[in-house]
C-alpha cells in the first residue's frame, strides 16, 4: 500500500503568484505521437471496461512518465483532523519542480491554519536530498537519501484516493494532440479517504484526468464528514487539488543554503 510521506495533514509549499523561485523555464511538453491514434480509454494504463480497474498500474505509469519527462506540479489540501485533542483544519500546499530523469529537483512544503506555521525547502539529485526546515523562528538542516518517486510525483498522496473509490470513465477527448480521459468516483470506501476519527462521509466527489501514458494531469476530491475526539464532535472537510502545470525538462537552481546543510 502506498503511504504519503507528507502525512495526514499534507503539508504544502507556498509560491508567490506568478513567480518561479525554483529554477529556469521548462521545455514545453510535447504530446507523444501515438496519442492521436489511441483507440479508446482502455488504452490508458490501469483502465479497462470503462473504469479504473487497476489503480496501482496507473500510478506506476504516472511515476515513470512524469519522472522521465520532467515536470512542475502543484498539490493543495485542506483536511480536518484531530490534533492534541482538538479538531483543527490543516491547510497545506506543495509545489514541485523536477528535471528529466530526476537528475535534480526542488520542492517547498508549507502548512498553516490550525497547525504551527512551517516551511520545508528541499533540493536533491540522484545521490542526496537536503532539507531546510523552518518552524516559527527555528531553522534546522538535514540530509538523507534521494527523494522517493511518490514524494515528487504526488502518487503517494493520490494513491489512497484512487484505490479507495470506484472510478468510471465520464469523458474522453483529444486536446492539442494529447488523448485525455476523465474518470469520476461513483462509489467510495470512506475509511480509505478519511483521517482517523473521521466518519459519515457525505457530499463526496472526486474527479481525475489522465493521458494516454498514464500521467495524472488533474485530480480533485472534496467532501464533508464528522470528526469526533472524546466528547467533542465537529464538522470536517476534505478538499484536495492536484494538477500538472507543465511537462518537460528544466534547469533546477541549487539554493544557496545547500552547502551549509551539507556541512551541518
Question: Which functions belong to the PLM regions below?
Answer:
Residues 1-77, 82-124, 129-130, 137, ...:
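Hydrophobic alpha-helical segments
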Residues 192-194:
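Acidic- and glycine-rich mobile interface elements
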Amino acid at each position: 500500500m502506498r503511504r504519503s510521506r507528507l502525512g495526514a495533514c499534507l503539508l504544502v509549499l507556498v509560491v508567490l503568484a506568478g513567480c518561479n523561485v525554483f529554477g529556469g523555464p521548462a521545455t514545453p511538453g510535447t504530446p507523444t505521437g501515438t496519442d492521436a491514434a489511441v483507440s479508446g480509454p482502455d488504452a490508458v494504463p490501469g483502465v479497462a471496461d470503462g473504469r479504473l480497474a487497476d489503480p496501482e498500474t496507473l500510478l506506476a505509469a504516472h511515476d515513470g512518465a512524469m519522472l522521465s519527462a520532467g515536470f512542475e506540479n502543484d498539490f493543495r489540501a485542506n483536511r480536518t483532523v484531530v490534533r492534541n485533542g482538538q479538531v483543527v483544519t490543516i491547510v497545506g500546499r506543495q509545489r514541485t519542480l523536477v528535471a528529466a530523469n530526476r537528475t535534480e529537483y526542488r520542492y517547498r512544503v508549507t502548512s498553516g491554519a490550525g497547525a504551527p506555521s512551517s516551511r520545508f525547502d528541499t533540493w536533491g539529485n540522484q545521490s542526496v536530498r537536503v532539507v531546510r526546515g523552518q518552524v516559527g523562528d527555528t531553522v534546522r538542516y538535514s540530509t538523507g537519501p534521494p527523494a522517493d518517486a511518490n514524494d515528487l510525483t504526488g502518487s503517494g498522496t493520490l494513491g489512497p484516493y484512487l484505490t479507495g473509490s470506484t472510478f468510471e470513465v465520464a469523458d474522453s477527448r483529444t486536446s492539442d494532440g494529447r488523448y485525455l480521459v476523465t474518470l469520476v468516483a461513483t462509489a467510495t470506501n470512506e475509511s480509505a479517504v478519511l483521517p482517523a476519527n473521521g466518519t459519515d462521509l457525505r457530499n463526496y466527489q472526486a474527479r481525475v484526468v489522465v493521458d494516454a501514458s498514464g500521467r495524472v494531469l488533474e485530480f480533485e476530491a472534496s467532501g464533508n464528514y464528522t470528526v469526533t475526539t472524546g466528547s467533542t464532535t465537529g464538522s470536517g472537510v476534505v478538499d484536495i487539488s492536484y494538477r500538472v502545470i507543465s511537462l518537460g525538462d528544466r534547469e533546477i537552481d541549487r539554493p544557496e543554503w545547500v552547502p551549509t546543510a551539507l556541512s551541518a
